[in-house]
């Protein structure tokens, strides 16, 4: 410790800042002095323990007394500790400790999160296992720690002399030579090959510019020129952390500063621009007040003749109208004069404003009232330029209390410094689909010259959202394949779906035997569906497929054949139905077909597991599933219970998947099989099972007559493959749909049609929304309450009752009586909606039909028309307003058409979450129900890009953007 010397400067605390710190600490009280004393004590104690020097021991004693020492002694002591730590003063000591902590944090972060980017380096790709920087033997030497350098991205080195072209960075741009790849034959469609036409040097230069632009979008908002610290903090606190976040705050609408060019009618939603004539807060009573703002606007009068316009120059400019904007307040606190003064001062006389809302005409000519409106103040200079050029004016939504005008100004500044070449998507792709560049899209949506330009910019941003989702999905599928040939074949099958099938001769022996046991022949559409599913089952990746077809088209037997294909290969199959009645029906149907099979030495073992299965029998079934004794299990939610363990589950079929929640449908994915099972049903078509098969999640086949919007959205986006059965079995007679209002006249006509059908030997379902009468909803008809009424109305016919509260035996008995003809009228709830098969049922009556969804009504209609009789479906609405929605079902019996209607009404749901309705939060611009036609274009573009470069190495900027937009954790397993 003899080397430790305290200079006079250090003994004087080194700087004024040190003394001020001590003074502040002293002023804050004894608690802070104790904290500082403990901090110094720990530092000096470590040195004293290591050195055993008398000086450090004496200093340790002084530190113990720091909290009670005088101010000047505290100052001297701090300087001694700083010198002991080999620092000039306390400032130097604090800076060193801060640097050590930052370095420690960086090392830890880079070790745990290798995708973290330091400085302005090139983004690290998330889709490949890139080697660390330290493993490269020919790296440009820099004084920077190698552990913080980025990973090489693509071929070709940058010349160090040219690095000054890029933004200032933490380390040089790194690229890697890779001349081992040979040119390959292009399998893309005509016009889809584009990289072969571009020189390598040009691609590298373009990629460099794009990377610089991507770094610009990722820069912090406080780096924007001319933005004050206060404004940058406001933007950051409202979520605008980066330039990209700011540019993605899009206008909610555009104002046409030329105003309306049409006649104004009551109820129209219009946008006007005008000047405030008056703003007045009025106290109408002791507890009621309102604000009235009068705005003068100019519109062109279409009601005037051309002759009038030619004689009057003033008329050519249009006529003036007056908008009375009114907002009402109730409560005594809203009648105080200070409040009234404050609200009327928000809109000053002479302000230029943009108003949007619903108009209502007043008695005075050219005077209109608006009670629901949005009002935005415009700037005179902006208004004059926009009006002179006829440009639309963007109206931004406020966020976090920020003024829309302020947001508009900041966005305009960002557009001025936006790089010209910033598009990661190849120009050939945007050119083929007639889309603008990314720079033009940002400018076009924020500062459009015309509404058409704004619409084109919106299409480009929508295309980006769809394209990256499609590209991520296809890229992930390609990475699961090994060879280039396999990847080419997969892409070709996506281009030509007709190839996605196998011939019947390639089916397993068990599947072909089951097909022969059917008492009827499959339709061509059914055979095509089976071949397509079996093709998917033979692939080395888990299947995720939706089987869609109208009610009664034969989806169940197609699923049975898919299960036989899996069982014939030595694995297990699970079939989950939403109701116990349907599970029993499927079990009995499959059992009978297996008994009729011929030419099979050992038939598959089938089991039934529902909530009503006795405990002892349920335990035996679980043991047989775990051991592999049961090859095919049919049941309800019991199949996904935690107690259930499968020996070798290979396929999970979810029947009527719209009845299950997102979590329930996903639980099958957790039922991984760990070992191969030797089939108890016969010889396996394959003797060996690959190790990859032993850890792969089971295939999932979902079936639905009307897909819920979320499933339809996933199918359109490509995360679910779609198989559609378009044909119907021969002899199937279409069901007539009739709509009635639930008044006395309508009910009388319904009963008349029921009696006519019963006299001809038919059987009638009558479905109600509730079981018992409800006091909260007295207008709803109840099944149990209506039983007595219907029985008296049809005394010559027997009536039965079926609902969900009944015991399983009672429900089965009621259904069997109706099936056998013992009862001719069955009053029920929606428990019969799914899968109940009574061929002689010829009429379906749905009371209070507006209480059911479109999918439910389509399913209920499918319970009739399964035999040779002509069938009818009668939908009874409670009011006239409900008939409009019900008429949609009367116009079509196509499940996909009705699913699109449901999609339009409800939205596609949370794509990556658990919500079943609403709009996609991941896509701020796209609306699937409106912009769904662009999905196919995005899919084609993704196929073209991956066809030209399977690993996206030819498009490094695109790959980096994909890594940021669609990380693996979002794509799922």
UniProtKB/Swiss-Prot annotation:
Residues 1-208 are annotated as: Sufficient for chloroplastic and mitochondrial trgeting. Residues 536-725 form the Helicase ATP-binding domain. Coiled coil: none annotated. PROSITE patterns: HELICASE_ATP_BIND_1, HELICASE_CTER. Residues 174-200 are annotated as: Disordered. Disruption phenotype: No visible phenotype under normal growth conditions. After treatment with the gyrase inhibitor ciprofloxacin (CIP), the usual increase in mitochondrial inverted repeat crossover products was significantly lower. No change in chloroplast DNA after CIP treatment. Residues 746-904 form the Helicase C-terminal domain. It comes from the Eukaryota. Its EC number is 5.6.2.4. One of its GO terms (molecular function) is DNA binding. SMART domains: DEXDc (SM00487), HELICc (SM00490). The first 208 codons are able target to both the chloroplast and mitochondrion. NCBIfam families: recG. This is ATP-dependent DNA helicase homolog RECG1, chloroplastic/mitochondrial. The gene is RECG1.
